[in-house]
Amino acid sequence: MHILVVSVNYRTAPVEFREKLTFQAAELERAMTTLQNQKSVLENVIVSTCNRTEIYAVVDQLHTGRYYIKKFLADWFQLEIEEVAPYLTIFEQDGAIDHLFRVTCGLDSMVVGETQILGQIKDSFLEAQQVKATGTIFNELFKQVITLAKRAHSETTIGESAMSVSYAAVELGKKIFGELTDCHVLILGAGKMGELALQNLYGSGARKVTVMNRTLSKAEIMAEKYMGHAKPLSELQCALLEADILISSTGASDYVITKEMMTKVEKMRSGRPLFMVDIAVPRDIDPAIDELEGSFLYDIDDLQGVVEANRAERLKEAEKIQFMIEEEIVLFKTWLSTLGVVPLISALRDKALAIQSETMESLERKIPNLSDRERKVISKHTKSIINQLLKDPILVAKEIAAEEGADEKLALFAKIFDLEMEDVESRAEEVEHKRAWTPSVPSL
């Protein structure tokens, strides 16, 4: 089995392509179920955010797994593989494990050290578990990754100086307008990104705030927290007439603000400029609007320069976290290496217990007058002898499993104890069929 990551992210793909490969939250479970039925895929978790769409998979063959995951992405988004392939980054084995740790800890984020990705990874993992897309390997790996990410943020100061993308959008607005006290601010979208933006705006002095959302009640709840006003999306054109700053993050599949709409609005704004930041992926605002004279449009990729603030300090903390990651990878690989020896140990235990059972039957025939208590005492002590005898061989088998040339050494181990390899292989298949189990996931 092999661990594989297929990634489309902000480093390798511009926002105009990333938005083509973004899974909507409502379709994520169906997507993971579909991917789970692809050839070679044994386990999978799909993570889709504004800056990345990534498929984490356990596959039985690397080459086959790579191909069918690429094909799945192309088919799902109705593209050709040739269109998708140039923007994909693929990580395998140790590189894949390291990438998952780095992403979850915020080291691969546009804003190094941000914590929002940790919650997004956990949510995707839980959804994958619900549709039985994960099994023994990913249940252990993701549990370990989430635990480390929490520890990394509590034991270092990387998160203290990290900006969110929403914060960066507000900082960009402050650079252009200076004080925000007299600015009319319009927030489109009442999700996490929108609320983070509003929180940062309020902290920067903005008080003339309007929140709009497809569900008006959500906009009202969010606006009330920050002394703002809520309006239905049907009044968007009027709201655009009043706004000085617009920050949009609705999660809509089509443009919420089109060039045609904005052309009409500009004619009624009497030359007043409108600063627009689109932090949604797919984008909410038609990029052609940037061609208009009075509209200044920035998308999520334009925020890269803003988030460079405090980067040196955060990178110093990132080095500490990378060291923690490397230690965890060693622990995970040690655990992973012992998976192959489980059927062998199981076969050894069963053979020893079968001998113990036969011995008990022989003893009862020779001493038929044993009481129930005597039988239980003898059975308990003979099993104890077996456990003590097997303790060292089992430890040795686990050590061998982590060494080079483990297959040959374990085959010799099986031969010494006269274990049938067919029986061991059969047990391995049984273990594989029982991959899906649900461990507790660390709370955030």
From Swiss-Prot:
Oxidoreductase among the record's keywords?
A: yes
Look up the coiled coil feature and give its residue ranges.
none
* UniProtKB keywords: NADP, Oxidoreductase, Porphyrin biosynthesis
Name its GO BP terms in alphabetical order.
protoporphyrinogen IX biosynthetic process
* Any GO MF annotation of the entry: NADP binding
Q: Does the keyword NADP apply?
A: yes
Q: In which pathway does it act?
A: Porphyrin-containing compound metabolism; protoporphyrin-IX biosynthesis; 5-aminolevulinate from L-glutamyl-tRNA(Glu): step 1/2
User: Which transformation does this protein catalyse, written as a reaction?
Assistant: (S)-4-amino-5-oxopentanoate + tRNA(Glu) + NADP(+) = L-glutamyl-tRNA(Glu) + NADPH + H(+)
**What InterPro entries has UniProt attached to this entry?**
4pyrrol_synth_GluRdtase, 4pyrrol_synth_GluRdtase_dimer, 4pyrrol_synth_GluRdtase_N, GluRdtase_CS, GluRdtase_dimer_dom_sf, GluRdtase_N_sf, NAD(P)-bd_dom_sf, Shikm_DH/Glu-tRNA_Rdtase
Q: Which CDD domains match?
A: NAD_bind_Glutamyl_tRNA_reduct (cd05213)
Q: What does this protein do?
A: Catalyzes the NADPH-dependent reduction of glutamyl-tRNA(Glu) to glutamate 1-semialdehyde (GSA).
How it assembles, according to the record, is: Homodimer.
Q: What is known of its domains?
A: Possesses an unusual extended V-shaped dimeric structure with each monomer consisting of three distinct domains arranged along a curved 'spinal' alpha-helix. The N-terminal catalytic domain specifically recognizes the glutamate moiety of the substrate. The second domain is the NADPH-binding domain, and the third C-terminal domain is responsible for dimerization.
Tell me more from the record. During catalysis, the active site Cys acts as a nucleophile attacking the alpha-carbonyl group of tRNA-bound glutamate with the formation of a thioester intermediate between enzyme and glutamate, and the concomitant release of tRNA(Glu). The thioester intermediate is finally reduced by direct hydride transfer from NADPH, to form the product GSA.
- This protein is called Glutamyl-tRNA reductase
Gene from which this protein is expressed: hemA
